[in-house]
Structures are given as structure tokens and as C-alpha cells.
Curated annotation (Swiss-Prot):
Specifically methylates the cytosine at position 1962 (m5C1962) of 23S rRNA. InterPro entries: PUA, PUA-like_sf, PUA_sf, RLMI, RlmI-like_PUA, SAM-dep_methyl-trfase, SAM-dependent_MTases_sf. GO terms for molecular function: RNA binding; rRNA (cytosine) methyltransferase activity. It catalyses: cytidine(1962) in 23S rRNA + S-adenosyl-L-methionine = 5-methylcytidine(1962) in 23S rRNA + S-adenosyl-L-homocysteine + H(+). Keywords: Cytoplasm, Methyltransferase, RNA-binding, rRNA processing, S-adenosyl-L-methionine, Transferase. Its main location: cytoplasm. It is found in: Cytoplasm. GO terms for cellular component: cytoplasm. Belongs to the methyltransferase superfamily. RlmI family. This is Ribosomal RNA large subunit methyltransferase I. PANTHER family: RIBOSOMAL RNA LARGE SUBUNIT METHYLTRANSFERASE, S-ADENOSYLMETHIONINE-DEPENDENT METHYLTRANSFERASE DOMAIN-CONTAINING PROTEIN.
Length: 396
């Protein structure tokens, strides 16, 4: 008999709607013993089977669902099916957009909770973020080796969220050669260098691909400020769009150095690119106080909120930074502003920008809305998968 997680009465509704998480508060009891990450059956209070998932006793998310099909086992064949299904969509995108790099697996939205896989050329970068994902590591790697024999696999499971599920952080080569210090990839006609081993996340923010492309239509002959620039994807795109100048700001010397190399790699005019190592909040105030003005500002900060208790503080941070940006824009200027915080809804983010405009004493028009690129899909039953949102705003 399999180990069963029994839900409290009335707590099965989210699973009936095929949401992939079971929170600790929904659990009545365990029947049997399961190790960290082991596959268990999830049943309602009367014993009716609901789903099969991975058990995580130390996490607020007590189980993550692998399947809602009672006949489906969690084995090599299961992971093969999931990966092949995901690859079909990425193949179409890669051919349509001329991509050599994309998100192959987007966790819950691809039916593989806690698993992120990014492909950069012939390197697969793996992040296992949940106990169930870690438990299935060997099976997953076996399937990847079979389906992608041409690819080396590199582990970037050096993410703090693993500690919440009782796991250590891991990083390093799994199979094949070590990634080069900087790996060139292609995106919408740009060549970009990616630091797989030491860069943010898996090395690069693939989710902003379409937003970087959209930037080009706003920047011709414009002065652009690129905040939280990282390795300069928005800066390179702005230069390709014909901007007169782009100022990239980041606290990381290493990231700015790669940004400079990316400008040179694309044979763009380096004299139009300025790189400033500074705190964005501080620099925006300095620019405001000395009367600097820009025509376009890209505001792409890191995640400000990790849990609900931080949401109010994050709202203040987003409002302050967008208020400063709005103050720095010329009349008719464009603010391209983003939030990658999953707890920040699009409606709330739009309200924050409206409040920022009021505090800045400017009128703002919302003219375009952004989300993560299409290789980061959002399954309908898991709205939390829509974490990246953004707006193009015209400042009057």
C-alpha cells in the first residue's frame, strides 16, 4: 500500500481545480512514512484519490503534484513524456524567433514542479528547487542525457529556497564539459555573453527576451537610462534600436564589464554607452538633484518581495523608485518598468505606478503591457506562474 497524505475535510477544492500545491494547513494526517521528496498519494478525508505528488515535511507547501492521473507512475517514462511535450513548444519558438537559448522547463507550468531547466546553446542548466525535484534528480538527469546527448548538464541549484525544504545548495558540472567563462548566445539579432557558472539565476534573464526587443521601438535618437542593467541586454537592444546614448547602472562591476563586452561583441558604438557602478536609488536622486533628464528609462529591479510579510515594504520600494524615474523623464518620455515578484499582481503594480506618478506630480499614460517570454508559459490552473509583469508608460 502506498503512503497517503490525507486532506482535512473541505480542503480538496484546489486539487479538484488542478492546482499543483498542497499547503500544510490542508493536511489532516499521513498514513505511512515517506522520506523527503518521496512520491505519495494524496486523498480527500474520505480516502478518495486526488493526485500523486512529492512529499516535503519541512515546507509550508507539504506536497507538490506530479500528476492528476491515477494510472501514471512517476518514473523515467513520466519525465520523458513531460520533457518531450515541453520541447515541442520550445522547438516552435526557437524556429520562429531564431533562438539558440530558451527555458526548456518552467516548473509547475510544464508539469514538473520545482524544476527549472534553461538551455544555452549546447548546455542545459538545471535548478532543482523542491524536495521532490531533488529526489528525482537521477531519473531526470538520465532522461536529459537520453534526449539531449549533444548537451552538457550543469547544476545551478545554489538557490536559498532549497533550505526551506531541508536541502543543501548545490552547484557544478553534472555531465560533459564545463561551461566557458562566458558563453555567447543569440537573441533577436543580438549576441550576448552568458556566465552560466557565476551569473544570476541560471546565468541570464531569458524571461525578458521579448521586453528587450520591444524596447527598440521607443529609443530611436533618444537618451536612455538602463537601471539594474545586469549584463546589458536592454542596453544592447537600445543601441540596436538607434538610441543616442544609453547609461547602464548596476552595483556589480563584473556585470557591467560583461555589458561592455556585449556592446563590443555586437560591433555597436561604444561611445554611446556609459556604464555606472552605483546604487540605483541613490543615483536616481543624484540625477534628479542635478537636473539630469532622459527620454526613456528601463526599470528592471530584482525581486523586492519573497513572502507576504514583505509585500507592504516592497510596494513602498517600487513606488519610490518609479516616482524618481518619472521625475527624470522629459515630457513625452517613456518608462519601461517591471516587477518580477510573484506576489505583486499586475493590478497592484499598475496602482503603484499610478501612485508614483501622483507623487511625482506628473500624468502618466499606460501604453503597453509586458509579461515573461513565451518559453515561460503559465498553466491556467497555476496563476502564480505569471510572476513577471511590466508596463510601458508615457509621461506627460
Amino acid at each position: 500500500m502506498s503512503v497517503r497524505l490525507v486532506l482535512a475535510k473541505g480542503r480538496e477544492k484546489s486539487l479538484l481545480r488542478r492546482h499543483p500545491w498542497v499547503f500544510s494547513g490542508a493536511v489532516a494526517r499521513m498514513e505511512g512514512k515517506a522520506s523527503l521528496g518521496e512520491t505519495i498519494d494524496i486523498v480527500d478525508h474520505q480516502g478518495k484519490w486526488l493526485a500523486r505528488g512529492a512529499y516535503s515535511p519541512a515546507s509550508q507547501i507539504r506536497a507538490r503534484v506530479w500528476t492528476f492521473d491515477p494510472s501514471e507512475s512517476i518514473d523515467i517514462a513520466f519525465f520523458t513524456r513531460r520533457l518531450q511535450q515541453a520541447q515541442k513548444w520550445r522547438d516552435w519558438l526557437a524556429q520562429k524567433d531564431g533562438l539558440d537559448s530558451y527555458r526548456l522547463i518552467a516548473g509547475e507550468s510544464d508539469g514538473l514542479p520545482g524544476i527549472t531547466i534553461d538551455r544555452f546553446g549546447n548546455f542545459l542548466v538545471l535548478q532543482l528547487l523542491s524536495a521532490g525535484a531533488e529526489y528525482q534528480r537521477a531519473a531526470l538527469i538520465s532522461v536529459l542525457q537520453t534526449l539531449y546527448p549533444e548537451c552538457a548538464i550543469y547544476d545551478r541549484s545554489d538557490v536559498a529556497v532549497r533550505k526551506k525544504e531541508g536541502m543543501e545548495l548545490t552547484q557544478g558540472p553534472i555531465t560533459g564539459e564545463l561551461p566557458p567563462a562566458l558563453l555567447p548566445i543569440e537573441e533577436h539579432g543580438m549576441k550576448l555573453l552568458v556566465d552560466i557558472q557565476h551569473g544570476h539565476k541560471t546565468g541570464y534573464y531569458l524571461d525578458q527576451r521579448d521586453s528587450r526587443l520591444a524596447t527598440r521601438r521607443y529609443v530611436e535618437n533618444k537618451r536612455v537610462l538602463n537601471c539594474f542593467s545586469y549584463t546589458g541586454g536592454f542596453a544592447v537592444s537600445a543601441l540596436m534600436g538607434g538610441c543616442s546614448q544609453v547609461v547602464s547602472v548596476d552595483t556589480s562591476h563584473e556585470a557591467l564589464d560583461i555589458a561592455r563586452q556585449n556592446v563590443e561583441l555586437n560591433k555597436l558604438d561604444l561611445s554611446k554607452a556609459e556604464f555606472v557602478r552605483d546604487d540605483v536609488f541613490k543615483l536616481l536622486r543624484t540625477y534628479r538633484d542635478r537636473g539630469e533628464k532622459f527620454d526613456v528609462i528601463v526599470m528592471d529591479p530584482p525581486k523586492f518581495v519573497e513572502n507576504k510579510s514583505q509585500l507592504m515594504g516592497a510596494c513602498r520600494g517600487y513606488k519610490d523608485i518609479n516616482m524618481l524615474a518619472i521625475q527624470l523623464l522629459n515630457e513625452g518620455g517613456i518608462l519601461l518598468t517591471f516587477s518580477c515578484s510573484g506576489l505583486m499582481t499586475s493590478d497592484l503594480f499598475q496602482k503603484i505606478i499610478a501612485d508614483a506618478a501622483i507623487d511625482a506630480g506628473r500624468d502618466v499614460q499606460f501604453i503597453e503591457q509586458f509579461r515573461q517570454a513565451a518559453d515561460h508559459p503559465v498553466i491556467a490552473t497555476y496563476p502564480e506562474g505569471l510572476y513577471l509583469k511590466g508596463f510601458a508608460c508615457r509621461v506627460m
